[in-house]
């Protein structure tokens, strides 16, 4: 979790240099990148003949990440009247999740990385809710933060069903 905290602090510094418009554009493309990785994890889980519920969870998370990207894109277009432009920065959530592909057969590792990724997303949506001037966007960001928390809990549940204990210090107090 210490690495996660450092990563979040670095990301906060990076975000602070962007305008609200740039942060929103960044996050749109980040959700799409995250979706691609969840699709890859679902494929790998199928190859490894892992439980169908885990495969389904990865697929659901991929679809939901795509939906989040689409929702954020609608907010962007409504707010700024144009299509978002890709921001040339690393996509933190996707970068963290991609670590799971380094050793996809190590299921506890994959689940831990995926759970950490969802916590990152939750915290970042909370941050967006704090900095936005748009009340409708604030509501959406808060909603998406809650959804990311449910993703974390779903992954934790999958781990428990498989008899895997994944510890992420401080995660349980992350909700409120």
PLM regions with names:
Residues 1-176:
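Non-heme di-metal
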């Amino acid at each position: 979790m210490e690495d996660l905290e450092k990563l979040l602090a670095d990301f906060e510094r990076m975000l602070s240099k962007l305008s609200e418009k740039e942060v929103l554009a960044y996050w749109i493309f980040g959700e799409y990148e995250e979706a691609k990785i969840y699709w890859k994890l679902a494929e790998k889980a199928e190859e490894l003949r892992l439980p169908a519920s885990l495969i389904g969870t990865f697929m659901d998370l991929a679809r939901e990440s795509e939906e989040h990207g689409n929702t954020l894109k609608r907010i962007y277009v409504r707010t700024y009247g144009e299509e978002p432009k890709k921001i040339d920065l690393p996509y933190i959530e996707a970068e963290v999740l991609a670590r799971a592909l380094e050793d996809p057969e190590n299921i506890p590792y994959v689940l831990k990385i995926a759970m950490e990724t969802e916590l990152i997303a939750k915290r970042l949506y909370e941050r967006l809710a704090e900095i936005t001037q748009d009340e409708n966007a604030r509501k959406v960001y808060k909603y998406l933060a809650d959804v990311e928390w449910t993703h974390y809990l779903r992954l934790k549940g999958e781990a428990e069903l498989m008899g895997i204990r994944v510890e992420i210090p401080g995660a349980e107090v992350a909700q409120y």
